[in-house]
């Protein structure tokens, strides 16, 4: 383990290999300061939403941040998505969009997934609060063969999209820099940028909720980040599920 003083002003822990950067922060949250960042050169058991797993490769960047008792816990997936988009554009110049809720899309390919997990904690005075771990997995330097052999036909890396290799720690620095800036920004500004970047809007989409599939038109993003849809029965709001 290497301990660095900070990354964009946040405490940083770097590892050669970890099962999961999110899991490490959950297990060690009590002994780590707020906004501690963890990265690993290789994440062997990474995970995404609804239990999806990540394929292990040193060409992917896993980066997670611990946020202790945030006031805006429900906003953090939206904030992370915008932060990653900004970081990708700073690093590579590629325009980045968001597939609701948490997939980052470049050139119609997924390049990053986001998983924000909360854990309930008790303070010394008995108060209950949430810690949130914001985890991001960015495809940085994988080649086309990796995605072909893995059967990931809708995924790409910054390398496959540009032909350039990138410094993973520089990518992490940009992500953390944008994330720390956006956490403290007015959320209405963030949600406006999220809406502008959302590639789901204006399309007919399939919604999968509780093992039930429906079709609807993705109309707008609500002020809280939910997806506003419309079908023959009228307008409705989706707060979770697959799109």
Per-segment meaning from a language model:
Residues 1-90, 94, 112, 123, ...:
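N-terminal lobe of the biotin/lipoate ligase/transferase fold
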């Amino acid at each position: 383990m290497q301990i660095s003083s900070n990354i964009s002003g946040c405490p940083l822990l770097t590892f050669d290999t970890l099962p999961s950067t999110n899991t490490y922060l959950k297990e060690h949250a009590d002994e780590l300061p707020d906004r501690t960042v963890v990265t690993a050169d290789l994440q062997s058991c990474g995970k995404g939403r609804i239990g999806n797993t990540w394929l292990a490769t040193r060409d992917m960047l896993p980066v997670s941040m611990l946020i202790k008792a945030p006031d805006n816990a429900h906003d953090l997936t939206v904030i992370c998505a915008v932060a990653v988009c900004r970081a990708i554009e700073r690093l590579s110049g590629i325009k980045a969009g968001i597939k609701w809720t948490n997939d980052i899309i470049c050139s119609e390919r997924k390049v990053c997934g986001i998983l924000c997990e909360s854990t309930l904690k008790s303070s010394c005075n008995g108060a209950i609060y949430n810690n949130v771990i914001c985890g991001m997995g960015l495809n940085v330097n994988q080649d086309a063969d990796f995605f072909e052999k893995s059967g990931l036909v809708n995924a790409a890396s910054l390398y496959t999209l540009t032909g350039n290799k990138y410094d993973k720690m520089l990518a992490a620095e940009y992500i953390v820099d944008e994330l720390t800036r956006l956490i403290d920004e007015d959320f209405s500004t963030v949600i406006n940028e999220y809406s502008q970047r959302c590639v789901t809007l204006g399309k007919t989409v399939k919604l999968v909720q509780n093992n039930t599939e429906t079709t609807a038109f993705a109309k707008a993003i609500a002020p809280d980040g939910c997806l506003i849809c419309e079908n023959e029965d009228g307008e409705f709001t989706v707060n979770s599920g697959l799109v």
